[in-house]
Amino acid sequence: MAIASFQKPDVKIFYNGVDKTDEFHWSNITIEDYEGDLSDRFIATMLWDNARPRMKDEIKVFINGYFLGKFIISAIRVDYKKSFDIEAVSVDFMSDFTKRKNRTFKDKSYKEIIEEIAKENGYKTKIDFKRMDEVNLLEQYDESDMNVCNKIAKDLELSFCVKNGYLIFFDRDDESHRINYFYNADDMISLSYEKKEKEVYQSCEVRWHSTKYARYKVARVGTKEPVLKITSLQKDESTALRLAEARLKSQKNLEINGNFSIIGTPFFAGAFINIKFDDTLTKKFLITKITHTINTNWLTSAEFI
């Protein structure tokens, strides 16, 4: 494969909003960016004599002028008198966002519920999905706000993530919210993928809770086997049936998993990568994880489906 030349990247570090690039003496930086609900991570290996950071302080990273993320310091690991590592994450796991709570969201839309959770935890929101104005009754019993967000996303077939101070929700099948990248396979440092057949469910059963009758009921789409069975926070049969239909529709009988590495590029997880192969055929994939490795060079690696 043809490979472009490596160049030393221009890295800028903002610490609690102040440019501390000249005081941030690092030898290696790794940034992990996920498409789903996993927390993005920033890891920097620092020279031993560098000033020690404080837990929960904020780090923003720019490479070659591109903003690559905002993170909260969550751990410091020491290799005595040699170096120390700073680990920072996009979600503060010691905050109220991850602590268990008990409450009821009554007569509120999904959008209002998400906005209330965001406001309580100091986040902004980016919300755009078909059912966001649907009024619901949602019970939060011994669950964290993050778990509630995950449940809403799972039940409504949404893409959900916490990035750069935002709670982001949109329909998983809505491509208008996803960036499209284009890359020639021959210009990649490495590219590998696997194809395999996957079982396709012919029917779907959704177990939902009826508040009117105070018991669980089952809504089903399809009559054939095999059957996908799920439990949902849906509160009526019509929304449970819509969920079942969405789950069946989202299935794929051919599963593709792959990865590639390229010269450092400001790609982000959740985007589409359109890869042009040597037979002039272009295939579109969803990037599920991006890893940026920065030292004297900048390498970008990705996982896709």
What are these regions (language model features)?
Residues M1-S95:
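Assembly/oligomerization scaffold segments
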Residues A2, S83, S90-D92, I127-E197:
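Short beta-strand-centered interaction patches in the first periplasmic/extracellular domains
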Residues H25-R52, I189-I305:
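An acidic/polar, Gly/Ser/Thr-rich interaction patch typically located in mid-to-C-terminal regions
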Residues A44, A88, N102-K126, Q140-K163, ...:
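Amphipathic, non-transmembrane alpha-helical segments in extracytoplasmic/periplasmic proteins
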Residues S74-K82, R172-S176, K284-N297:
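Short, compositionally biased
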Residues I76, K99-K101, T125, E134-V135:
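Sec-dependent N-terminal signal peptides of Gram-negative outer-membrane/periplasmic proteins
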Residues D79-F84, V91-K101, H292-I305:
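Short peripheral tails and domain-boundary helices/loops at the edges of structured domains
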